[in-house]
């Protein structure tokens, strides 16, 4: 037996879970239900799901904007057909987040819509073009919709305090249109600002048949799903009521289900056995499931293993990210490592992904049980995230470890589509005028 085969067997015993997936599913289910009843940072109700919705065929356009980082995306979307009529994107070169930050963004959007015929000049039309606007905002917001923090190189200013993202964007539209009314003859009604997890869930709900779960596995790990409204503890029902539009009679709610932003990255503290190479600071203990499944932390565990066993030098120049791990798992052409170690490195990458897939399969099955959808005998999951999307091995291992048939459907453009769907559904319920 070679040294490398001995090392591979040692790592296999350290990495792959010793417990059965049945036991892990049971423990995850208990933790999900406990967090639903008691936790204030996970298993959070985001919006109510009406039992019946009247369909509409809007003449007004839905403009969706995706604030996801340094590249801003926007689109004109028609529903209920889910047609992206026009989409565009541009880099955000201004990183000071103040009123001028939003003004510049809105001016660029209006300019490009006008150039493509969606906004007319005042002398070209007798009636202003009307748009409903929905926004996906991927940075943390407080319950009032105010910005809590912004990373990725953005610098917040005090001018944001006391204003919601919805108010800031609506104010910028008003300013830009009023100052350029001859060029931008239109009205913009900002309807919704939602986070990316909810956007994925709404897209999944709208596109996938019999779906119960939407999944995000990119640099982070999260899931959204519906549970019966009666599952909510009183303090979460009260908090949800405060977020509802004034058009709701908050005392006579007639809903059976509520959409949950689960923040599943926090799950597994007493279930997932982290190894020394999995420790990347306090975050590993706070978010164990995200630590072992996401495209941000799993690659760093691989790097730590290779350093620990002197397979790579400390000054190794290659960045360990999700893309690299996906290529290693698929045994792509070696362009980074010494050939004598390459087969072992690929094997270690696959072991880490197998562990990730085991826990993803377990959490998905636990969610499936508490949503009450287990009688379908399969789980239809709409998902996003480049880490999962780019790894066929990861997706196949999730299916391998699951005792229920899993269908994974990638939801392209979900941040844009989900925002439009939020406005579409709520306009059907007469929340949007």
From Swiss-Prot:
GO terms for biological process: chitin biosynthetic process; glucose 6-phosphate metabolic process; glucose metabolic process; glycolytic process; intracellular glucose homeostasis; mannose metabolic process; UDP-N-acetylglucosamine biosynthetic process. ATP binds at residue 152. Residues 51-194 are annotated as: Hexokinase small subdomain. Pfam families: Hexokinase_1 (PF00349), Hexokinase_2 (PF03727). GO terms for cellular component: cytosol; mitochondrion. Residues 195-413 are annotated as: Hexokinase large subdomain. Induction: Expression is up-regulated during sporulation and unfolded protein response. Changing residue 152 to A: Severely diminishes the enzyme activity. N-acetylglucosamine (GlcNAc) kinase that transfers a phosphate onto GlcNAc to generate GlcNAc-6-phosphate, which can be a precursor for glycan synthesis. Can utilize a broad range of NTPs, namely ATP, CTP, GTP, ITP, and UTP, as phosphoryl donors. Shows only low glucose phosphorylation activity. NGK1 may play a role under a certain condition as an alternative supply pathway GlcNAc-6-P as a precursor of UDP-GlcNAc. NGK1 is phylogenetically distant from other know N-acetylglucosamine kinases as well as hexokinases; and the amino acid sequence identity with others is only about 20% or less. This is N-acetylglucosamine kinase. It comes from Saccharomyces cerevisiae (strain ATCC 204508 / S288c) (Baker's yeast).
